[in-house]
Amino acid sequence: MHSFASLLRYGLAAGATLASASPIEARDSCTFTTAAAAKAGKAKCSTITLDSIKVPAGTTLDLTGLTSGTKVIFEGTTTFDYEDWAGPLISMSGKDITVTGASGHLINCDGSRWWDGKGTSGKKKPKFFYAHGLDSSSITGLNIKNTPLMAFSVESDDITLTDITINNADGDSLGGHNTDAFDVGNSVGVNIIKPWVHNQDDCLAINSGENIWFTGGTCIGGHGLSIGSVGDRSNNVVKNVTIEHSTVSNSENAVRIKTISGATGSVSEITYSNIVMSGISDYGVVIQQDYEDGKPTGKPTNGVTITDVKLESVTGTVDSKATDIYLLCGSGSCSDWTWDDVKVTGGKKSSACKNLPSVASC
């Protein structure tokens, strides 16, 4: 397996003003103060500054189809009026796009207006940010507060997200649920570097994709660093994933791989390295092949293979009522695993593990 880290190394309408000293610069640099102006004028700008935009209810801040090479800067406080709808609040696509946050900026979703403790099962709530078709691009230094539901939906090739802060801490007491930070699918080449997340669902969830690198993460609350659920999608392959140098605290799980019962697919070339956990309420390490309708059944199947899984220096503590390690594999579907310095303590030992490779233990 190749380390992905090593691969990485080798306006125009009302509400818009144009900053310039010449006609050419006037077309190139745009500042927008409304979502409508940004949508109308985006194609004519090589640099877009979004200054304290208040996005109308039920409206997406639409930055899809950006001209190649466009730079996007969030400035001031971006807010969103309330409506029960599926979103997204922001959508962006294009090639070679650079997205940054200006000093002191904030993207405040004010998610408590939607939170009801039910997540996707309650009233309609908008997802935050679609990075779909945002290829060969980067998102750096965004400060995000209180997303109504999932934060980033990533379906892009060769995209890097660095120094992203997602602070949904208020959701712990106000009913935040299904507030995943980074959901990755149908992507080749995703780098997530030094994120800081406090949420109420997965810090990272990879449903499909290849060449994915997550490093330097701080994950508080939520459900940990997850692969899956894999299966029953148009793409059921997860390959060459490195998740490293990250902490998971006060979460349900720390390290998790889950696959759908009766489905087919593959999870391969997976590395969890230098993961430190604390305050885990359910499972320190959990790999299971029995999910159906979003819940475990206790009956694993072997249609989705889990191979070449490496856990190294995965350490820490779980709560006394939690389970240190739980491994539930189908017959012959978990193989070629490597475990080194996996030390999870503080909880119960599982007697229900099944079909685990000889190098692993519960």
UniProtKB/Swiss-Prot annotation:
Entry function: Involved in maceration and soft-rotting of plant tissue. Hydrolyzes the 1,4-alpha glycosidic bonds of de-esterified pectate in the smooth region of the plant cell wall.
Keyword Plastid assigned: no
Keywords in alphabetical order: Cell wall biogenesis/degradation, Disulfide bond, Glycoprotein, Glycosidase, Hydrolase, Repeat, Secreted, Signal, Zymogen
Record-listed E.C. numbers: 3.2.1.15
Signals that turn on the gene: Expression depends of ambient pH (higher at high pHs and lower at low pHs), probably under the regulation of the pacC transcription factor.
UniProt subcellular location: Secreted
Disulfide bonds: C30-C45, C203-C219, C329-C334, C353-C362
Signal peptide boundaries: 1-20
pH-activity profile: Optimum pH is 5.0. Stable between pH 4.0 and 6.0.
InterPro entries: Glyco_hydro_28 (IPR000743), Glycosyl_hydrlase_28 (IPR050434), PbH1 (IPR006626), Pectin_lyas_fold (IPR012334), Pectin_lyase_fold/virulence (IPR011050)
Protein name: Endopolygalacturonase II
Glycosylated sites: N240
Domain of life, per lineage: Eukaryota
GO molecular-function terms, A-Z: polygalacturonase activity
GO cellular component terms, semicolon-separated: extracellular region
Biological process annotations from GO: cell wall organization; pectin catabolic process
Active site residues of this protein: D201 (proton donor), H223
Predominant location: secreted
Family according to the record: Belongs to the glycosyl hydrolase 28 family.
Matching Pfam families: Glyco_hydro_28
Residue ranges of the propeptide: 21-27
